[in-house]
Amino acid sequence: MMKGLVIWKDGHASLEEMKKPEMGEYQALVRETAGALCGTDKEIIYDVLKGFHNYPTVLGHEGVGRVEAVGSKVKNFAVGDKIVLPFLDDGEDFYSTWGAFAEYAVIGDAEAMMEDGHTVGDGVLTEGNMAQKKIPQEFDDVEVF
């Protein structure tokens, strides 16, 4: 289990227990260390983001974390790597609006999937998969934003 900051339709927030995400063979488990609010998050909190109706939700598509475990086919991430984490999935308990305000997330290794012959139909080239990148260890987790 893990904790995540959940936003409810009426705009209030609460810290909730939820399932820790399970990683697949092309994914890595990342422990979140920092997250940032953006204008999209604010619009979701105040329920004014056009077309968004998926409450309760875990906010955050601007996060930083460290890899804690990797799937068997991951080639481009290793335990201990520092990662920029946009567009995350926080598990099954709450609809995720990217999920950086939860303790853990999974990221995909799109490059390894492509090397192994996976295609767009397999979800390889989604914006989220392509945006998840390693950053230098010496970068401060908060200053990255």
What residues fall within each predicted segment?
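Short N-terminal binding/cap micro-motifs at the start of the first secondary-structure element
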Residues: 12-15, 39-40
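NAD(P)H dinucleotide-binding glycine-rich loop of Rossmann-like/cofactor-binding domains
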Residues: 90-145
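Cytochrome P450 core scaffold surrounding the K-helix E-X-X-R motif
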Residues: 40-46
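Residue-level signal for short segments within beta-strands and strand-turn junctions
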Residues: 6-8, 46, 67
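Conserved hydrophobic/aromatic beta-strand scaffold that supports enzyme active sites
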Residues: 15-17, 64-66, 82, 104-106, ...
